[in-house]
Amino acid sequence: MAIRLYKAYTPGTRNRTISTFNEITNKKPEKTLIRKNHRRQGRNSRGIITSRHRGKGHKRLYRTIDFKRNKYDIKAKVVSIEYDPNRNARIALLHYSDGEKRYILHPRSLNIGETVISGIKASLEVGNSLPLNYIPLGTAVHNIELNPLKGGQIVRAAGTYAQIVAKEGAFVTLKLPSNEVRLIRKECFATIGQVGNIDASNINIGKAGRNRWLSKRPKVRGVVMNPIDHPHGGGEGRSPIGKPHPVTPWGKPALGRKTRKKPKYSNRYILRKRK
């Protein structure tokens, strides 16, 4: 993926960058693999905001992605590489030899016309999916399951990959993109390679309106709100927050307070915390 830099024709184009989309080969998605995506704008079923700073954004169709890769020992051909508005990674359309079509996350260096396969007997080639126990040490993997047969849940963002560090007993040790080192059961499937579109993190948004297209609303500081809206609010002019330490809109300690639940079951599988 290459990045295109705009000239400063307007303040909105100054320093603005976009993807050139050179790897995209098909502009229209497969009709059998799309569905409507009702956007809730951060509201729950009662209309109350439960996730702040989320707006409507541009209308999108949801592409059904195969995170399970459960068509074992059936070869599939990569037909096209497409844009997905719901994620920063690209997606690849597969045509299986039995006639079924599925989308998967597009791994880096996987080209059109190549074949991929899933299963214990799969070779160690980019795009193939197999259990962690059958993947050698040092291999880069993505779309990793946390529980067997549940489907890939971690390492799915553009440009990310995890590395297999060790194998012992019923578990495989993985180093994640966050530098966290954790144990995962050896029966869990993972896909060989790194997720494509590695320059996604280098994109410069350029203007506020582009963030609104992406369903992101402005994040207003609590100190400039009214007292009824935030504990930091109120006062005359530029006044301090009036508290010994920052707090959330609901009065709980913020900035430096760890938010992960202590009695979480998965703590036993984390060997080194993320940094």
Swiss-Prot record:
MF GO annotations: rRNA binding; structural constituent of ribosome; transferase activity
Keyword line: Chloroplast, Plastid, Ribonucleoprotein, Ribosomal protein
InterPro entries: NA-bd_OB-fold, Rib_uL2_dom2, Ribosomal_uL2, Ribosomal_uL2_bac/org-type, Ribosomal_uL2_C, Ribosomal_uL2_CS, Ribosomal_uL2_dom3, Ribosomal_uL2_RNA-bd_dom
Superkingdom of origin organism: Eukaryota
One Pfam family cited in the UniProt record for this chain: Ribosomal_L2
Record GO biological process: mitochondrial translation
Cellular localisation: Plastid, Chloroplast
Main localisation: plastid
Record's compositionally biased regions (Basic residues): 255-275
Gene3D superfamilies: 2.30.30.30, Nucleic acid-binding proteins, Ribosomal protein L2, domain 3
GO cellular component, one term: chloroplast
Region feature Disordered, mapped onto this chain: 36-56, 224-275
Family according to the record: Belongs to the universal ribosomal protein uL2 family.
Assembly and interaction partners: Part of the 50S ribosomal subunit.
NCBIfam families documented for this protein: rplB_bact
HAMAP family named among the record's database cross-references: Ribosomal_uL2_B (MF_01320_B)
Listed PANTHER family: LARGE RIBOSOMAL SUBUNIT PROTEIN UL2M, RIBOSOMAL PROTEIN L2
Designated name of the protein: Large ribosomal subunit protein uL2c
Organism annotation: Gracilaria tenuistipitata var. liui
